[in-house]
């Protein structure tokens, strides 16, 4: 019987993901997240101030053709708006025709606009200048080249300025706004006055072009430019004054924002959602070593590169402009308790996260400095940014460090984590929380505790909304759906499913867990995505939950019905060994008995899904279409577990696989092409199926040649796993015990020389396991007396079948 499927190993979290990164829906962004079209100036720091940012002096001369086009557009807009205005009942404007004459010189200062209007003098309403405040958009169609503006790129390895922000990205100047490429959540023009980042030192560049405005004007567009020398002189004077002011501010309060781009915090890095980054750590089938979710790990886990030697600095004592010496872990842990400075706490948590990335010494220091309880306290803060920073740091701290995992448990950290997972709605934070739980679940001493406490919250908070099983029922739950969160949660449950009988019982009894997992797998098959990254975890969960299900699951209504067996038909055995079976032989009489058939239940509930016909078909589909080695192995292993028990359910499933679904055709392909591990599981499944005599004809007809071909030759140097050889010998024993015709089929496939060769193998203390199984098989073959003459004709003697080695092996097997 197959052991439970192994669990995933842990993975650390640097600034990126499976610590998880995805951009939350822009529709959820608050008003402060939206972009303004202009920048604040030296003395205007009001939240709603969006005054005009004027261009540089050397950019004031624009092309005549472009200027004429802009003015003509404005005039046409004015005329069209005036024509659309309603006419009063008692007085109306006459049909007015306006003609525009535009003359221009080489300078914008001599630009003139002449208008002639024909107006009904009885009208009491006077025409006014264009009211730009009523334009459909406050933004110009295109910013002219030379206009400096902040642009925060979402691809910069730093913190974006949303509600989940932690550090500032680099802010290069751009020639114009690229509105189709700039997500609103990442764009802010009022960043320099945002008090949330007063204590942070980030890699930010001040635009090279100074920004200035006229505080007395209400202009929001750049259409009307100064047209006289007096106005241009006044503008030059204001520009010079503003340059001096900004230079002073840069020497003071803003200097902390001008670090090199090479200085970066190990903070969140947004990544594309759903498309899985190639290369993950395998499930290590056959090993009981846990696997933890590791973000940014080296090797086969998905990873985004980060700068490991980035110099991280903090402002000291809250004084703007002062940079402290290089931060130490002790200082960072102490800063976690500064409740009056949230930005400093976030920065300290990010520094700890950075240091603990691939640094075992840093993790040990955090334990001795009592940093874990302080981070757990920060997780209870109302700030999402602080929660994210604390969870991300804790995730790295516990990676591959069992002492830190136990410290989280001893500090009552698990209730804090699960409570935050239940109430938090931020996708980034939920990714970190599920990744943290995955890492914690890899410690064997925590699995039982986590099985009791975490299975139900993970099912309700993650599996239900992310699997799609509740789609259309609750729109709020759909907002929580995220593939990385689901992947982390199923990784945690995969570990917990190998905790033992008690853990398996909790998971089987958890309402909705099995339904969600199966619903998700069936969805990926229907969408032609059987190699989805979370599907492997889901199949491994079911693999472990199916282990010894017949013994561990309370008796329920049997899902089988008695079905009369069809008349047994002998398989043709072309070759030198031919035998005729009497009509009233024991094997034919036995073939007339009834056998259990798996009922087609369209709506299983809970644990019934484990042995449902729908689920069995699902596993066969995965075997056929999946290219993920571990998904395929887990699918075969689950069928092996389901057919391994001695009850009616296992017998019914075996008949369903062979006779109803034609599953042996898939097994045959595995025997021909599979790797060693898949081959081992496949022959184990066939061994379970070979226990039922009514299925022997199908086995002999479809897969016997492949089984014999796998047996090692005496002259073949290829190393054959001994377990595979032993299992094939047991299959042949089951076949030969039931029927002399099966024995003829085995010999006609050329198996006898191989079996005799295997039986002679010795390890120095006696026959090997494979040798013992081959000896029992030879003894079984000789029991068919009607074949003795055929054996002699083929050149074999009785001593080839019955000798001291075979007799000793048979006696040992009986004991």
From Swiss-Prot:
GO terms (BP aspect): cell-cell adhesion; desmosome organization; heart development; heart looping; intermediate filament bundle assembly; protein localization to plasma membrane
Domain of life, per lineage: Eukaryota
Entry's localization field: Nucleus; Cell junction, Desmosome; Cell junction; Cytoplasm
GO molecular function: cadherin binding
Coiled-coil ranges (or none): none
InterPro entries (UniProt xref): ARM-like, ARM-type_fold, Armadillo, Plakophilin/d_Catenin
Gene Ontology annotations for the cellular component aspect, listed alphabetically: adherens junction; cytoplasm; desmosome; intercalated disc; nucleus; plasma membrane
Biased composition (Low complexity): 91-105
Disulfide cysteine pairs (residue numbers): none
SUPFAM superfamilies registered for this protein in UniProt: ARM repeat
PANTHER family: PLAKOPHILIN-2 (PTHR10372:SF25), PLAKOPHILLIN-RELATED (PTHR10372)
Family: Belongs to the beta-catenin family.
Protein name, as recorded: Plakophilin-2
